[in-house]
């Protein structure tokens, strides 16, 4: 309640909701935004996205219900609950992954495919090789998207710095302002401790 105003014997209440957050796909046509719903309709891609959101919400609600049942089951030990919850989590993420893969296959060059590709590239355990396989399924428009190129660049950096991989050489300056490279020290037959200090 923001305020109440009395005027001419009537009391009027002004209520300003805190915030609305409704995403939509900008496309030609009349986009209908129902603020009580989780999506928009009225245009082809927005209507498809809203339907997919409803399906996912139902799936998520089912998974949450099953999770609460496991947590409340007094006949299961803590270890058995942990195993059951992990199995449920694995099933849930496998389903989400398969739905996103299907969305990318059906929509390789539009906003629904972009959302699916972002979801897939953000999943735990994604590797550069699996990301590149996903990019092969995506259209040029999706592959050129700035967010997608940033996600793939991050995966490239992660792969380049994996434990056991050849170090990534870089240059800095020492206390005497002399240029030094990591390769000046690494690979000389001794242990090297590198301390990064940012000020």
Provide a role label for each language-model segment.
Residues 1-98:
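A non-transmembrane, solvent-exposed segment enriched in polar/low-complexity residues
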Residues 76-86, 124, 162-169, 197-199:
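A short, terminal or domain-edge coil/loop segment
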Residues 31-33, 179, 189:
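A broad, structure-centric signal for solvent-exposed, well-ordered loop/edge residues
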Residues 11-21, 31-32, 42-46, 82, ...:
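N-terminal targeting signals for export/organelle localization
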Residues 181-199:
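Short active-site neighborhood of thiol/selenol oxidoreductases, capturing the structured segment around
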Residues 149-187:
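N-terminal "domain-start" segment that seeds a small globular fold
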Residues 116, 170, 194:
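Conserved hydrophobic/aromatic pocket- or pore-lining residues that grip, position, or stack substrates
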């Amino acid at each position: 309640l923001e305020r109440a105003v009395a005027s001419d014997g009537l009391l009027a209440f002004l209520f300003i909701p805190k915030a609305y957050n409704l995403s939509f796909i900008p496309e030609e046509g009349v986009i209908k935004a129902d603020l009580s719903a989780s999506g928009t309709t009225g245009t082809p891609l927005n209507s498809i996205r809203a339907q997919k959101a409803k399906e996912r919400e139902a799936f998520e609600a089912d998974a949450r219900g099953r999770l609460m049942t496991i947590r409340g089951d007094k006949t299961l030990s803590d270890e058995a609950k942990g195993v059951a919850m992990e199995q449920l989590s694995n099933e849930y993420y496998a389903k989400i992954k398969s739905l996103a893969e299907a969305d990318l296959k059906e929509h390789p060059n539009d906003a629904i495919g972009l959302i699916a590709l972002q979801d897939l590239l953000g999943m735990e355990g994604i590797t550069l090789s699996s990301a590149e396989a996903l990019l092969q399924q995506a259209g040029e428009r999706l592959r050129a998207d700035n967010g997608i190129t940033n996600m793939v660049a991050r995966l490239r950096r992660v792969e380049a710095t994996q434990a056991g991989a050849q170090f990534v050489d870089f240059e800095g300056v020492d206390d005497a302002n002399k240029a030094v490279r990591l390769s000046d020290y690494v690979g000389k037959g001794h242990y090297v401790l590198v301390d990064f200090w940012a000020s």
